[in-house]
Design a protein with these regions (language model features):
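Multi-pass membrane proteins that catalyze or facilitate reactions on polyprenyl-/lipid-phosphate substrates
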Residues: 1-180
Length: 180
């Protein structure tokens, strides 16, 4: 099952997200407190810029997700978990690490996007659960579903557009944007 590229991607998304979930739950409170600290957010953007800069200058590898080891997958999950802090890009950290592991740029981008989907869905469910448990919600279910649908469609469009552009350009522009 885990010998094909798709099987390896499934394992990456499953096993790689275990440390992410643990770090996300453990550091949630601290991350929420740091979100109001402009210096902490700025440091997060600086970290993102450095990772993108490194990813942009490293020679592209030839490996595929099939070549990832268990340790590399767990390290990807830990890196992704560090993105709970404000300003730190989950995508940039995972992308840079995959490129450092010798993955092709195309497979690195695909893995980085796919790896964050379960985390984002889990965070969404976690947040909605908190929202409803507080009883302070004044939005109808229909309005919320429409917002979710619109957000999902917009996200798919933006991800697709970003993936097309990122194949053609370097990460330098976004790295500079993060610094500014």
């Amino acid at each position: 099952l885990f010998t094909s590229n798709y099987g390896r991607l499934a394992m990456l998304c499953t096993v790689g997200n275990i440390p992410t979930v643990i770090l996300g739950i453990f550091f949630r409170q601290l991350a929420e407190e740091l979100a109001t600290n402009i210096l902490a957010v700025g440091m997060g953007f600086l970290i993102t810029a450095i990772f993108l800069l490194v990813a942009g200058v490293i020679q592209q590898g030839t490996k595929t997700p099939q070549d990832l080891t268990w340790w590399q997958i767990l390290l990807l999950g830990i890196c992704q978990g560090c993105a709970v802090f404000p300003g730190v890009s989950r995508f940039a950290l995972v992308l840079c690490l995959l490129i450092l592991f010798g993955q092709t740029q195309k497979s690195s981008i695909r893995c980085a996007v796919l790896m964050q989907v379960p985390v984002l869905l889990g965070a969404f469910v976690y947040t909605v659960r908190d929202l409803f448990s507080n009883g302070n919600i004044a939005v109808t279910a229909v309005a919320m579903l429409l917002c979710i649908l619109l957000s999902a469609l917009t996200s798919c469009f933006l991800i697709r557009t970003m993936l097309k552009r990122i194949h053609k350009r370097s990460f330098l522009g976004f790295s500079l944007y993060c610094v500014l």
